[in-house]
Amino acid sequence: MTTRRDFIRQATLLGAGLSMSPFFINATPGSVGANDKIRVGLIGCKGMGFSDLQAFLRNPEVECIALCDIDDEVLNSRAAETQKITGKKVKNLYKDWRKLIDNKDIDVVIVGTPDHWHCLQMVAACEAGKDVYCEKPLGNSIEECNIMVRAAEKYNRVVQVGQWQRSDPHWQDAMAFVHSGQLGKIRTVRVFSYQGWCPSIPVKPDEPVPAGIDYDMWLGPAPKRPFNRNRFHFTFRWFWDYAGGLMTDWGVHLLDYALYGMNVTAPNSIMASGGKFGYPDDACETPDLLQTIYTFDDFTVMWDHAIGIDDGAYGRNHGLGFVGENGTLVVDRSGWEVIPEKVS
């Protein structure tokens, strides 16, 4: 049986990208004493935050003792779902995330809020002595990310970002092939996300804040604006005040693997072009089409995204192509393949 100490050790390995298998899924069932429970609190219950909590709860050592959301309807429904999963009522329900951070019984905080909140909440959790699982992207700027890294180091906390593909074996296998050198010299990496499921967002008028929603808390560090449903819950990601569009939604996953595969960090130069070409008059602010070229010493990484179109490169709607002189390795969430270079 995995002990509390083992859990923290495995979490550290995952955060460092050193563990291949998600420990949530493969935990060995067994009896766990109350003092050995890892007590988790979730901030932001609507989307990926609750998916993350469900993954945590697959480990019998994890106990959810707190949920926080600014929307009463979301908070109450997630509390009921959590009770159905665990058979226990969640002890603490909050609308103010600071009260969750102040709860001394919590060991681990899951940050599942919109992107503009990640930095403040992750840093506060570290200051309070909590370990943190933070949804991607880590932050909305390089400086935010630097602050977050410094906080994790200063307070000696275990922090993992939601780059969950790092724990998926077939991605690791694909990178092992890239690193083997069998592709020959890699001249470019094509990274793409064509998301046909993303609809145009019709313009809607501002309206009064619905009952049960603490909108001022939702805005937090973002500029003060009237309530508009287009900017709230899932579709926040298409507005610059809170996020960066498809680039920071999908790009953060896929570009991570471009850097990992090529064993690099920052490029020498970046050039980008795009705009609202597919849906020029809808409510979204972020580009629905974008191409970006990152130039390194002897290769490039090319990002390409489109909203409302599914037909991307290599017959896939997302993925990476490591283009080498001997062939191209293509990988996405369904698997990977090597396409040999044709010899005339």
Where are these regions (language model features)?
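A contiguous active-site-proximal alpha/beta segment in oxidoreductase catalytic domains
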Residues: D131-Y133, G139-G212
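Secondary-structure transition/capping motifs at alpha-helix termini
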Residues: K88, A125, A151-R157, S180-G184, ...
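N-terminal glycine-/serine-/threonine-rich beta1-alpha1-beta2 phosphate-ribose binding loop
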Residues: M1-C134, E143-V158
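Structural recognition of the beta-strand scaffold that forms the well-ordered cores
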Residues: V40-I43, C64-C68, I110-G112, Y133-C134, ...
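Short, solvent-exposed turn/loop segments enriched in Gly/Ser/Thr/Pro and often Arg
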Residues: D71-V74, Y94, P114-H118, L138-N140, ...
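Contiguous beta-strand/loop segments that form the cofactor/metal-binding neighborhood of enzyme cores
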Residues: D173, K185, R190-F192, G196-W238, ...
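A structural signal for well-ordered alpha-helical segments within the folded catalytic domains
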Residues: F50, C119, V123, N146, ...
